[in-house]
């Protein structure tokens, strides 16, 4: 991979005496990135690694600090940072410029992010019979005269003026959002009263998408002997029932179509708010330190990853920058007691 250009410019700002920070603009263009590129069946290999294309990353980073309160006994300050980034493919080889390059759940296409999902378009559950329905791909499932094959017609149904199919084989693919968040960053709160200090650090992300492959596996009724999600209790059972979980049966084609196929059904927002650290500390007073002949002593209790607000229980949206979550562990909760002494 080579860089064709890198630009970074930082500005320091001070709005009022107690509010200051920095604003930094950046832009980086890269070429000859490594990607797995699908090959024709006649080649004898499924994919090969190639140096292809150009990608541009640009955005702005903002870092602000504000002294809210400062008195003899009390001090309160807050800080926050935010990064806004835009990722875009600016050039592909001539042979791939029209149709792009499909790479697992993504599609490389000029004008789109390398982390933008390319997935079957899930519509929902047919309330009449519990079938899982996809938006029908008419463009690739008709002949030159615009006629649909009889085998395909049997899978079709019309809902709300839209032609749908109960087979993932005839589902329409489309761009479905990016794993790159609109904004991400963190903020902190620091409070002190006399000898006590309390500090917290949060991290957050807004606007990205994540393909929850772990949840897909838990909802797959075609797999026997595996753990299953309690959401399967919401499966369709009665005509007219409105639900987002298709009916459960032992038809292998039905199970494959609704469970094993990757689609926007398994795509969810990757927004999160994580309380990363909380620390409470006490600084021993001079009256005690002088007696035991110590310069300073500080006792602290801290906790990490106390909670995370997110779209779905068990999902860890920050585990994978590419936006695919599969058997990822949640951040472990850690508790620490510390003593710092200076002689």
Region roles according to the model:
Residues 38-40, 44, 57, 97, ...:
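Short capping/connector residues at structural and topological boundaries
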Residues 205-297, 303:
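Extracytoplasmic gating/loop element in the C-terminal half of outer-membrane beta-barrel translocons
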């Amino acid at each position: 991979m080579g860089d064709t250009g890198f630009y970074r410019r930082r500005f320091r700002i001070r709005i009022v005496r107690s509010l200051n920070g920095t604003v930094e603009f950046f832009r980086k263009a890269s070429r000859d990135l490594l990607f797995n590129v699908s090959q024709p069946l006649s080649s004898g290999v499924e994919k090969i690694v190639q140096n292809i294309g150009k990608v541009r990353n640009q955005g702005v980073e903002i870092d602000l600090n504000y002294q809210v309160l400062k008195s003899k006994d009390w001090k309160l300050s807050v800080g926050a940072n935010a990064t806004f980034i835009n990722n875009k493919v600016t050039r592909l080889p001539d042979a791939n410029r029209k149709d792009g390059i499909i790479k697992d759940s993504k599609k490389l296409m000029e004008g789109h992010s390398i982390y933008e999902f390319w997935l079957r378009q899930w519509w929902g559950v047919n309330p009449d019979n519990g079938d899982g329905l996809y938006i029908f791909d008419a463009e690739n499932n008709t002949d030159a005269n615009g006629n649909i094959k009889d085998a395909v017609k049997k899978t079709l149904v019309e809902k709300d003026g839209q032609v749908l199919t109960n087979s993932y084989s005839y589902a329409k693919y489309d761009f479905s959002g990016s794993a790159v968040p609109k904004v991400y960053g963190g903020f902190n709160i620091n409070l002190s009263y006399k000898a006590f200090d309390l500090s917290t650090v949060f991290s957050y992300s807004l606007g990205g998408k994540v393909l929850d492959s772990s949840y897909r596996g838990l909802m797959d009724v075609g797999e026997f002997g595996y753990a299953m999600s309690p959401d399967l209790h919401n499966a369709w059972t009665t005509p007219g029932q409105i639900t987002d979980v298709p009916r459960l049966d032992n038809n292998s084609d039905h199970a494959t179509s609704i469970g094993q196929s990757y689609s926007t059904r398994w795509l969810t927002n990757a927004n999160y708010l994580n309380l990363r650290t909380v620390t409470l500390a006490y600084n021993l007073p001079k009256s005690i330190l002088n007696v035991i002949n110590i310069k300073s002593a500080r006792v602290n209790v801290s906790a990490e990853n106390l909670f995370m607000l997110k779209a779905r229980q068990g999902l860890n949206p920050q585990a994978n920058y590419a936006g695919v979550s599969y058997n990822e562990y949640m951040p472990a909760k850690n508790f620490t007691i510390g003593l710092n002494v200076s002689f």
